[in-house]
Amino acid sequence: MNLPNKLTIFRVILIPFFIVFLLVPDMPFLPSAEWGEWIALAIFVIASLTDMLDGKIARKYNLITDFGKFMDPLADKLLVCSALIALIELGRIPAWMVIVIIAREFTISGFRLVAADKGVVIAASYWGKFKTVFQMVAVCLLIVDIPVLHILTQLILWIAVILTI
């Protein structure tokens, strides 16, 4: 297994750690609940950066594989959708927005599975990558939940939802 594929798998492995730090407020080894959110943010940022890094490495060193073309967008969907569902639990995003995003992601994943069953691997498009970046930035802003950034957060979140449609 090559490095880009390992980074993609690493991104998926980080998801449960991200969720625990985001949603479990009273960890005895942390001074306060805010620490958990900041650690969750750091994990999410690292996972998001692996998304950018795995693709760059794969293209630069000609390490593109069918596994990577299929799993990389799926890992992104798992990361973003898990984060959005957790953020509903924290009351930071309306459930309807998450439903719109997840419905679209499931639909696209379904198309990918049908294509894969027929021996065709569909790589992520430019617009899909662009949408994912906006979703990831929106998630980061929703995690930190800084009141001064509320308007910016809402703007980026709306752009992410519109790009999703």
Language-model region placement:
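Alpha-helical transmembrane bundles and membrane-interface segments of multipass inner-membrane proteins
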Residues: M1-I165
